[in-house]
A protein has these predicted regions:
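Bacterial N-terminal signal peptides that target proteins for export
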Residues: 2-17
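Bacterial N-terminal signal peptides
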Residues: 15-26
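Contiguous, structured surface segment used for ligand recognition
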Residues: 31-160, 411, 434
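Substrate-binding groove of N-acetylhexosamine-processing glycoside hydrolases
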Residues: 37-39, 44-45, 52, 106, ...
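Extracytoplasmic/secreted cell-surface and envelope-processing proteins
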Residues: 66-68, 201-204, 243-246, 302-304, ...
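Short, hydrophobic beta-strand segments that form beta-sheet elements in well-ordered domains
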Residues: 96-98, 162, 338-343
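Feature activates predominantly on carbohydrate-active enzymes
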Residues: 104-322, 326, 330-332, 339, ...
């Protein structure tokens, strides 16, 4: 999957500026008392509230799924009011949850919710519909009661999902994934996709997985069972076309690669195809969704190595279709539909009509383009079902670039609905391994809202509802703080082609000339960058003070703000150290200026200590946040970057300390070039 960082043109920068200004400065929507995500199809607000004093009862039938939904509702009431509702069998209570087979307008996942001052009823045809009605009711509960309202609701898309890269860095703990799934289910997400290159410990291919970095069959089955209880299906994506560089570097598998340096299996190699079919056959047993995703993006190597003759004889398109068809047979025999990334077929549109008719194209596009119609037309015109797959734009960045992600999710999901898409997957990617899921809640939950609501989903409605629905906090301090963190991308794009990428956090003014040159580019907006991140931290802490749930997830927002703040600080330190050393050089030969020279040198030493301390604090916090959601696997690779950064600060401090002592003993100072303080 090409998670490519592209430079943004003037048009994109203008859109980013307008988006940020809108998010930070928009007034509250008049009359929007109900803060709900997703936004229901129909809401009629009334007057008054259903009180939740002592003696609240929740009436529900004997079905285990419905009683589980009732237990979540009881927990919500207890958390909001301190009261402990009773769950009773039957159809009489303060709140009634009931199946209503005649409610055909609700479809398979819709519901009807009616709240009166005397009681509330949630009705649905199915367990899923009742579950989703309860999630809406939970968001309506406040300590002073439930607002009177009538809601009729059903989803726009059958499948509403999140795509989680677990293969190139962070591997979540089972507990963290369960929490994600339970939280996403509150927002009516019903599909969770795990992207694996070698993050599954296959029984049939034990060399695939790295120790400590893979899910066992028992873990995947337990996760699927947990997800099922929350009406979420687990979708396994196992790359079998490419992105298998680590696997194909092993002696046991290197002969299966298209070329000696390729991460792609060779379609001309029977053993390569057998491996792919074996992996997918086992993956099908773990995927509780009706699909298995086979990958298949970025097929750039096929035909360059051992499949050259086959491709020359039949054409790369025919080779691709034959292989996909074989994989489709393997999965169909196990009751699964084949999902595949659509970019190769989009570049060869004549192949669409030759694809297996039950296959599903995952059409990804992470841009903020105005229209996505052409991206879907190739498949829909050939009668192929599609998933639309926008992106959280979190990859290789300190924080998701919301100025790209929100319009992308909004536009692609809206277009998918128009074209009859089967579902939506909001994609998170972990390129370079320095990625934390806790940073992604805002775009991921926006995707949930966009996939459920029919038509366009208003980002302003989402902003005003985010704090309440995710944190149970009044106001919109957290949403505003998130916008301020994300504004770093717009601030930095004003002076450089790229946005706030991870690479910026490793620029060190104590290192070489390239780092100093790049930091000099950031110097102009450094103060603005620091101010906005300080405001973000303050806003996040205000939200934390009133949050009743998920307050710990604000730690990720604050960490991103501190990391971005440090980038601005490093740009400032670079200029100060350069100026101080220049002043020291200019005055070192004046006998009456030795005190001034030492003051300047000591000031630089102090700045170096400041930079090192800041880096150490970020390292410790990063490690804590990583372990709060991930296994220790791979963490050492990121900590090594922090350690190298710390070493740079320390080595420069040591060198300058030697120069300072030497100066005190009569030696001249090294040149600015020699000390690394030159422009």
């Amino acid at each position: 999957m090409p998670r490519i960082l592209r430079a943004h043109g003037k048009r994109a920068r203008l859109a980013a500026i307008l988006w940020t200004a809108t998010l930070l400065g928009a007034p509250a929507i008049a009359g929007a008392d109900l803060r709900l995500v997703p936004e229901p199809a129909s809401v009629q607000e009334g007057a008054g509230r259903l009180p939740l004093g002592g003696g609240v009862t929740i009436a529900v039938g004997n079905d285990d799924e419905d009683r589980f939904a009732a237990s979540l509702l009881a927990d919500e009431i207890r958390d909001a009011t301190g009261q402990s509702p009773r769950i009773v069998n039957g159809a009489s209570g303060s709140i009634v949850l009931r199946r209503e087979p005649s409610l055909t307008s609700a479809g398979d996942e819709g519901y009807r919710l009616e709240v009166k001052a005397s009681g509330a009823t949630v009705a649905a045809r199915t367990a899923a519909g009742l579950f989703y009605g309860v999630q809406t009711l939970r968001q309506m509960i406040e300590p002073r009661g439930i607002p009177v309202a009538t809601i009729e609701d059903r989803p726009a898309l059958r499948w509403r999902g999140v795509h989680d890269d677990i293969s190139r860095g962070p591997v979540p703990t089972l507990e963290a994934l369960e929490r994600r799934i339970a939280t996403l289910a509150e927002f009516k997400v019903n599909l969770y996709a795990l992207y694996s290159e070698q993050a599954i410990a296959y029984r049939t291919a034990p060399l695939v997985a790295n120790p400590g970095g893979a899910f066992t069959p028992a873990e995947l089955r337990a996760l699927a069972a947990f997800a099922r209880r929350h009406h979420v299906a687990l979708l396994i994506e196992q790359q079998v076309f490419g992105h298998l560089d680590r696997l194909l570097s092993l002696e046991s598998y290197k002969a299966l690669a298209e070329t000696p340096t390729s991460g792609a299996l060779a379609p001309a190699n029977a053993n390569a195809r057998a491996l792919a079919e074996s992996l997918l056959a086992e993956a099908a047993t773990y995927s509780s969704a009706p699909f298995v995703h086979v990958g298949g993006d970025e097929m750039t190597d096929v035909g360059k190595g051992q499949s050259r003759d086959l491709v020359a004889a039949r054409g790369v398109g025919a080779v691709y279709v034959d292989w996909l068809t074989d994989l489709d047979r393997t999965l169909a025999a196990r009751g699964k539909r084949t999902m595949f990334w659509g970019d190769f077929v989009e570049s060869h549109p004549e192949l669409a009509a030759k694809l297996p008719k039950d296959a599903v194209a995952a059409v990804w596009d992470y841009s903020g383009r105005e229209s996505f119609e052409a991206r879907l037309a190739t498949f829909r015109g050939a009668g192929i079902d599609v998933f639309v797959c926008p992106g959280a734009t979190n990859w290789s960045r300190v924080f998701p670039n919301l100025a790209t992600a929100i319009p992308n999710i909004r536009g692609l999901t809206r277009e998918g609905q128009k074209k009859g898409a089967l579902g939506e997957l909001t994609c998170t990617w972990d390129d370079n391994g320095d990625a934390l899921f806790g940073l992604c809640w805002y775009p991921v939950l926006f995707g949930a809202g966009a996939a459920w609501k029919s038509g366009d989903y208003d980002p302003e409605h989402f902003r005003l509802a985010f704090d309440w629905t995710f944190l149970r906090a009044p106001g919109h301090d957290a949403a505003d703080a998130i916008a301020q963190v994300a504004s770093a991308h717009t601030i930095l794009q004003a002076v450089r082609p790229m946005d706030a990428t991870i690479e910026l956090s490793w620029l060190n003014p104590a290192r070489g000339s390239l780092d100093r040159q790049l930091l000099a580019m950031i110097g102009a907006p450094a103060l603005e960058l620091r101010r906005t991140q300080e405001q973000a931290i303050e806003g996040a802490e205000r939200a934390r003070a009133s949050a009743r749930r998920n307050a710990d997830q604000l730690d990720y927002v604050v960490f991103a703000a501190r990391r971005l703040h440090a980038i601005g600080q490093r740009a400032i330190l670079a200029e100060r150290m350069k100026a101080y050393y220049k002043d020291a050089l200019e005055n070192q030969r004046a006998p009456d200026k030795s005190g001034r020279v030492l003051d300047r040198l000591n000031a630089i030493l102090g700045l170096l200590v400041q930079g090192r301390e800041q880096s150490a604090l970020l390292r410790d916090e990063y490690q804590r946040l990583w372990l709060a959601e991930n296994r220790p696997y791979w963490l050492g690779n990121v900590l090594a970057e922090f350690d190298r950064d710390l070493q740079v600060w320390s080595e420069k401090w040591d060198r300058l300390r030697v120069a300072t002592v030497s100066f005190k003993n009569g030696a001249p100072l090294p040149s600015a070039e020699d000390m690394g303080f030159a422009p």
